[in-house]
Amino acid sequence: MAAEFNNDWDDLLKDEFEKEYYLNLRKFLIDEYKTQKIHPSMYDIFNALKFTPYKDVKVVILGQDPYHGPNQAHGFSFSVKPGVQTPPSLRNMFKELNSDLGCYIPNNGFLESWAKQGILLLNTVLTVREGQANSHKGKGWEIFTDRVIELLNKREEPIVFILWGRNAISKETLITNPIHKIIKSVHPSPLSATRGFFGSKPFSKTNDFLVSINKEPIDWQIPNI
C-alpha cells in the first residue's frame, strides 16, 4: 500500500512502496505503532513531502530523526507543533537567523510556513520511539530518503541543500549535479553550534543564491502565534 502525497511525489515514489525493503519497513512500523509510543503520529510521517511538491522544492534542510519527546514531532525536520517549547537546536537556528537576517526570535518552533515556500524539511529517518533517539535507524527509512535526495539531485532546476552535522553531510555524495548549491556546517545543536554554525549565514547565502537564479527569496521569519 503506497502512501498518498496528493502531488507529484506520488508518481515519483510509487515504485518505492513495492520494494522489499519498504514492505519490511512497513511491517516493522505496523508492529511498532501497535506496541510502542512512536513519533510522529502515523498520519504525519510524510508531511514534508505532502506540503512541498517536488516541482516546488527550492531548499532542502536535512535533519536526522524526529524529535522523540511527547507532542513535538509532526513530520518536518527541526519543526515542532504550536504550543511546544522550541528545542535547543531550533533555538540556535533562530539566533543565527536573527544575526544573519535580523529576523526576530519567534515564540514558537512551528516551521510550516517554510514548507509552504518550497523548503523540504526532510529527516533521513521518519519515525522514532518515544524517548529513544535513533531507535528506527537502519530499518529502511534511509533507503527511502536517499531515493528522495537522488530524485531531487536529478532535477533540472537548481536546489539549495543545507547540510548541518555529520549525518547530513554524509548525504553530500548523493548530490552530484553541479547546478545545485550545497551549504554545510556543524550542527546547530548546543554541542557544536559555537564551532562553526554561529556566523555561517546559511539563510542569507540561500537567499543570495535564489536571487542569482531569478527565484523568489525565502521569507525566513517565523511569525509569533
Curated annotation (Swiss-Prot):
Q: Which SUPFAM superfamilies match?
A: Uracil-DNA glycosylase-like
Mind listing the UniProt keywords for this protein, alphabetically?
Cytoplasm, DNA damage, DNA repair, Hydrolase
Q: Which InterPro entries match?
A: UDG_fam1, Ura-DNA_Glyclase_AS, Uracil-DNA_glycosylase-like, Uracil-DNA_glycosylase-like_sf
Q: What is its EC number?
A: 3.2.2.27
Q: Which GO terms describe its biological process?
A: base-excision repair, AP site formation via deaminated base removal
Q: Where in the cell is it found?
A: Cytoplasm
Its GO CC terms are: cytoplasm
Q: Which reaction does it catalyse?
A: Hydrolyzes single-stranded DNA or mismatched double-stranded DNA and polynucleotides, releasing free uracil
Spell out the molecular function terms from Gene Ontology: uracil DNA N-glycosylase activity
Q: What does this protein do?
A: Excises uracil residues from the DNA which can arise as a result of misincorporation of dUMP residues by DNA polymerase or due to deamination of cytosine.
What name does UniProt use for this protein? Uracil-DNA glycosylase
Its gene name is ung
